Amino acid sequence: MNPIQPIPKSKIEIRIKCKDLTSKDLLSQSDPQAIVYLKQQQRNDWIQQGKTEKLKNQKSPEFKQSITVDYHFEEVQLLKIVVIDIDKDIKLLKDFDDHDLIGEVNVSLGSILSSPGGRMKMSLTKNGILSGSITISTEEIRETGANIYFALEGNHLDKKDLLSSDPYFKIYKSGGTLVYQSDVIKNTLNPTFPPVYLKLEELNGGDMFRELTFEFMDWDKIGDHDLIGRFTTNTDTILRGGALEFEIINPKKVGKSGYKNSGIIKFYIARIQGDPTFLDYLHGGLEINLMVAIDCTASNMPPDVSTSLHYNTPTQPSQYASSIAAVGNVLAPYDYDQMIEVVGFGGLYNGHTSHCFPFNLTNGDDNKSEAHGLQEVLDIYYNNVLKIPFSYPTNFENVIHHAIKRASKSTQSNQKYTVLLIITDGDISDTQKTIDELVSASKSALSVVIIGVGNYHFEAMKILDGDEKGLVDSKGNPSKRDICQFVPFNDFKNYPEALAHETLKEIPSQVLSFMKLSKIHPNQPRQFNC
C-alpha cells in the first residue's frame, strides 16, 4: 500500500444568516458582512476562505454569497466567522480593529456538518457580550461542471404600494437556504428580470429534482419588505422548455373570496450550458475599447534627431508607431464606435510636467483626446510628437488611474472592456504607486499591455507583469486577477503580427476573469438583420 496517496476531500458550501445584530451606529443599522477564516494548524494562523457581500442597513441579514471550503474528515478544521461593519477590503484578521467588529464565533467544521441538516445556530459575541445570533448552513457540493441560465418575467403581480410594486425575487433550495436574489425592478406589476446565471450545484446541489422555492417580494425603502407570493418547482421542470408558467400564491390570501393568485411568472429562457467563452461575450455585444499612452520623456531623445525612438520617416516608422499599428489593427474591429483615446505622459503640458495629458494639442480641448479609427491615432501621433517638449521622469500611476475611471462602466446590459496600451522606453520611477494602481485596476474592466521600445533592460516592467509573483499593493491587498502583460519590442521588431500576438494573447482570459469576478454573464447573441 502506498502511504502517500491523495487524501479524498469534499467541497463544502457555507451559507450564513444573522439575527438581531447590535448596531454600531446610534442613528442607523449596521452594514454587515461576514468573513470566514480557517485555522492553519501548522502555522497557528487564520487564513481567509471567503466572504459574503455587504448588506446595507440590515439588522438580520441573510447573505446570498456562499463560501466554499475543502473538507478533510481526518483533520480538526476550526473556523472563525466574523461579522463586521467596515468599508475597506479585508484580507487578514489584523486588517480590522475592535471598533469594526459586530461579533464573532469559533466552531469546527465537523461540528456543523454533524448537526441536524448540517446547520447550526450559535450566539455571536464581542468581548464576551452577546451581539446577535448566527445560523451557519453547510452542504456538500457535487460539482457538475455545468451552469444553468434562465430568465423570467411576471404579469399582473399584486399591487403592494399606492400605484404599483417594486418586485424582486429570491430562490431557496430545500432546507430554506437562500441561493439567489434578483435586482429590484421599480414601479411595475409586469417585471422582466435580468437573466439568472448560476453553477448548477449552487442552485440544487447536483439534484435536478430538488425542490426550489421562488419567493417574490415588494421592496420598501423603509421597514420590512412585503411578500407578494411564492411557488415551488425543481430544476428538471424549469428546463422542460415551452411556455412554462407558474401562479404565485400568497398564503395569507388563500381561502379569501375571489382569490386566484398574486400574479403569473413565465420562464422564457431556460438551458444548461458550460462555462461561458470569450466568444459568448463578443456575440452578446461585448465592446473592447483601446486607449493608447505614449512616453514623452527626454530619454527618448528629441523626435527630430535620427537616433530618437520617436524618429519617423516615410519608409521607416518609429517603434512607437509600429507598436500602435500592430496592436491597433487587432483591437480596432472590436470597438464599435472606433473612438480611441490617445494620451501622453512625461512631457510638458501647459508649462508643467504632466504624467497624463491629451496627445492631440491642435484642438485645445482636454475633452477631445479621442481619435476616430487607427489611422487618426497615427495621424495625431505624427502631427503632435514634434510639438511636445519632452521632460522626466517616467511614471505610470496617473495614466493607469485615468484608465480605471474610463473602464469602470461595464455592466450586465452594457458590457465594455478597455485595453490600455502603454509604450515606453525605460523603467518607471513610481513602481510601488504603479503597483497600487494595477491592484486597484484588477477590480475594473481593464487590461494593461506595456510595450518596451529601445534597448533598455526593463527590470521593473517584468515585476509589473506579475506572472512569476502576484502583485500586492502597499496596504497588503493582493491583485484580484492578472491584468498586466509586458513585451519588449526588439524581440518582435521585424514581425508585427507576432508582436500583436504576444502582447494581446492574454486578453481573452483576462476578460473572462473580470466577468467571473463581477458575476456578469454573456447577453443573448445579437441578431443579424439582412
Curated annotation (Swiss-Prot):
One biological process term in Gene Ontology: cellular response to calcium ion
Keywords: Calcium, Metal-binding, Repeat
Residue spans crossing the bilayer: none
Residues annotated to bind Ca(2+) 1: D25, D31, D85, D87
Family membership noted in the UniProt record: Belongs to the copine family.
PROSITE patterns registered for this protein in UniProt: C2 (PS50004), VWFA (PS50234)
GO CC terms of this entry: cytosol; plasma membrane
Named cofactor requirement(s): Ca(2+)
Lineage: Eukaryota, Amoebozoa, Evosea, Eumycetozoa, Dictyostelia
A Pfam family annotated for this UniProt entry: Copine
Domain VWFA: 289-507
Residues engaged in binding Ca(2+) 2: D25, D85, D87, D100
Domain (C2) ranges: 1-122, 130-248
Name of the protein: Copine-D
MF term (GO), any: metal ion binding
